[in-house]
Amino acid sequence: MNPITDWTFYAVAVPAVLLLGISKSGFGAGFGSLAVPMMALVVTVPQAAAILMPVLLVMDLLGIAAFRKDFDRRLLAFLLPWGLLGIVVGTLSFRLLQPQWVAGIVGVFTLLFLAQRLLFPPRADGAPPPRWVGALLTATSGFTSFVAHAGGPPINAYVIPLRLSPVVFTGTMAFFFFVINLAKWLPYAWLGLLDWRNLATSLVLLPLAPLGVWIGVRIARRIDQQLFYRFVYLGMLLTGVKLLWDAVA
């Protein structure tokens, strides 16, 4: 098992993994979707996704440990079946899709959601999104998570309007993405995306996982709710622009 040794790969992969860890803690949620596009500067998108798989699972476990009492059980029970459905769709269509197409769709959707939130801010007493919207967005999250580890923007578009506290938001997302990422292992292996070289490279990057999550957890537990969601929006903005750029470049 010989990992990647090219220093240019690690010059990009190290900050990408740290950014992913900070995002997994809940602080700056949405920034994590930049990890695969960043690593795609030095390796292919499928290889970047495969390398990040074990790292993501460790980060999810750390997030669950940090927020194990802070999650919405009823919301999670609603989200998980739809997210898993998205993985099934992603598995069946993976070889038919160009990653650029998916990146473009997610990028446009993310920017439209942000524009709607900024131009028409929700009222404090406004009704939450209907459940059919949640089902559609969560299935989309499972799909985009499978093909590009970019599941954050779609599910954020549903969960953010629910106005959860930062801690409950973070805990719920940690549990959701742990199940989603765990469910991706078998399809990834079936599609031939996992190999010993990628797994060895994952082991090299693994020590960065707790560092990124630790930084994000400390910030998330101390930040004001309004400021927290501003960082979420900023992360989604950068993600949307980068994904759209990847689609047209």
What are the residue ranges of the model-derived segments?
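Small-residue-mediated transmembrane helix hinge/kink sites in multi-pass secondary transporters
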Residues: 37, 91-95, 157, 217
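Small-residue-rich hydrophobic segments that form or flank transmembrane alpha-helices
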Residues: 9-77, 137-142, 152-213
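Interfacial loop-to-transmembrane junctions
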Residues: 214-237
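Transmembrane helix exit motif
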Residues: 60-70, 105-130, 217-218, 238-249
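Glycine/small-residue-rich loop that forms an oxyanion/phosphate-binding "nest" at active or ligand-binding sites
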Residues: 71-118
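Hydrophobic alpha-helical transmembrane segments in multi-pass integral membrane proteins
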Residues: 48, 89, 93-94, 99, ...
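Residue-level recognition of pore/gate-forming positions within transmembrane alpha-helices
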Residues: 56, 83-87, 110, 177, ...
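Cytoplasmic-side transmembrane-helix entry/capping segments in multi-pass membrane proteins
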Residues: 72-83, 104-107, 128-138, 168-174, ...
